[in-house]
Amino acid sequence: MFTKFSGVIALLGGLTSAIPFVSTPTTTLSPPSAPVSPDEPVTDVASHGPYNGPSPTTTGALSTNVLAPSVPAAPPGPDAYSYPSDGQLHGAEPAPYTPSGGLGTNGSAPVYRVLTDFDYQSIAVALYQEWIELDLFHWGLATFSDSDFQAAGLGPYDRYLLQFMAEQEVGHATLLSNILGPSAPSQCTYNYPVSNVHEYIDFCQKLTRFGESGVYGFLNHLNARDVGQLLLQSISTEARQQMIFRQFEGLFPMPVWFEVGTPQSWAWTLLAPYISSCPENQTRLIWQNFPAVYILNQPNPARANGSDVWNETTGPWTNTLSTQDIGQGESCLDSDTPGVNCMPGITKNRSQPLSYPGRQVFLRWDDPGQAVGPNNSYVTNTTAGIPAFAAWVSQLNVTYSALQDVANNSAWTVQPNVSTFAGDPAVNGTMYLVLTDEEVYVTPFNLSMLNPRVYGVALYQAG
């Protein structure tokens, strides 16, 4: 039978395929592609614990001819204020829709290799960081049982997320190893200051904090702009990891408006103590290891009242929380009260802050000259005198508070009341508390100018 509809179909002829029709969803099958193996081999590290091997044959940071005791401060460059910044175009366009200026925009093909010692040593310390994260995430899953994670509020989906973060680190380690070439640092063995899931998660969120900040500090100083682009795309993932660990810990996920960037020596100071040993002929680093700093009343996110603490860390440097002295009913995991309970969640907020302006913070520090890092082959060192100030380094700010009652490698100070902009307390989140002998004016782009006056570096759990 010829119907009106079928007549239309006949008239359209070859265009009939354009007429929409209802279909059942199906799965599109494609032949599997061959997996691409990482160029850098990844091994399961069987040894975890402090180094107990022979004395190192090489000690101290890598060094060559030193031209001056520090980089002298200088005024802004001659062109720092020359651009009018008026919204108008002030140069010819090199191509349509392309403003004049920029770096790496002249059409030269990127090669993604380091160009200077600064580039190499910066990428190398970042690779040391990727290796420890790869091991740490796997280690936690292998060490603690499903029921251990469940007791901390972390179920199978959370554990798989942790597994996926470890897989991300395979990609990061491969990328940076390929950039550096055959001399790239290899995976080491490690020693973690934790004994349960809550301590483990706290250590992870602190480790990823200084890993993230350590890259932000040098990223825009690299000579190899193309390498910086790849590293940016890697560290952006790590920023997400750090926030996830805060959520796992029941902390507010992102309590700051800006993330801080720190010098490489700060990152290496905080990382090296957790590396037990590295393979023979491992590439060594130039960066400084500052003496250890202990925060005696470091806020403890595992407590219902996290600021009411004394000596509840598993050690210096990251000053990771300890649950050892938390009694029955004192853990925030045991509370059902909103604002106190710290079970994992997308977001949480505490009725009692972990820290606050005016809080006394008690400190102790080690003498320099201590063996630290892989095979105990690095030595802590400082060019600063006796500490006189605490530098609170967070977001865009470096704010100093005077140390009080300085004696016998100990002192106390008071948390300052300072904001980046109105409504944003600068002292918040997982931040840096740095001991110095002077108040040096520095800003985010030249923070390393503070290093000659730094005695020691620690992480402070402000929020």
Can you annotate each of these PLM segments?
Residues 1-24, 131:
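Fungal secretory targeting signals
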